[in-house]
Amino acid sequence: SSIIGIGLNVNQSDFEGIRATSLANIKGSNLGLIDCLAETLEAFDNIYGRAQKGDLDEIQKEYHSRLFRLNKEHPFRIKGDKQPATIQHVDEHGNLILRTASGNVTAGIKEIEFLF
């Protein structure tokens, strides 16, 4: 069995550094927590229903189209070395595939660091 958790910064407005934001910062005003929860659950239900109907390829395309910094070169720390890389996609195992000067790199969770 597995437990999956999702954390959302809803109405927080101040963050140390630039690594995080909140829905309130994006929208420009605070959100009602119950309404936010209802919209989030509705979105999950919609995607789950589509997955049950076999719409996995389209869901995956939508997911990839929203990846942060997709197809844009950005500095990363890979195996301790700072180097530019370009996010290509996420594979079927959840690994991030990056293009570097020396070739493609496959990285699992906590194996690379996105540098700001």
Which residues does each PLM region occupy?
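Long, positively charged amphipathic alpha-helical accessory segments at protein N-termini or as interdomain linkers
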Residues: S1-F116
